[in-house]
Amino acid sequence: MTLFPYTTLFRSSKKFESTFLGLTIPQNDSVMFGSLSGDKLGIWVAHGEGRFYLPEPEDHYNVIAKYNYAEYPGNPNGSDYNVAGICSADGRHLAMMPHLERAIFPWQNAWYPADRRNDEVTPWIEAFVNARQWIEERAFKK
């Protein structure tokens, strides 16, 4: 049995691309993304691979991030079900193609809401805070 029953392939455009686009975080119980459920956030993609090939129906996967559009260029990889991120059933292991670490600060974003320009960090930081808290809760148990 594999950790993730999927394969990643070269993107449909068959070339390296770097662009800023939107993701939706569906309801999920993953360690890093659970608290972001329902959010729509901007993010960078920068790679030539990463097209999720998902041969089973979508509900067979623990999808934690989806591109806002199903077609190119909004789904730059051509991923099935416009999936941008997926995680293991227990929520601990994440596979994601966009680069959330490149969208942590508002100045890194190609667009950021005017009414939030005073933010020191974007909501993406929450994924890293969640991971740290998860580790701390388990590392210091007696």
Describe the role of every protein-language-model region.
Residues 10-142:
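Amide-donor transfer/coupling interface in amidating biosynthetic enzymes
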Residues 1-8:
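Single conserved hydrophobic/aromatic residue that forms the stacking wall/gate
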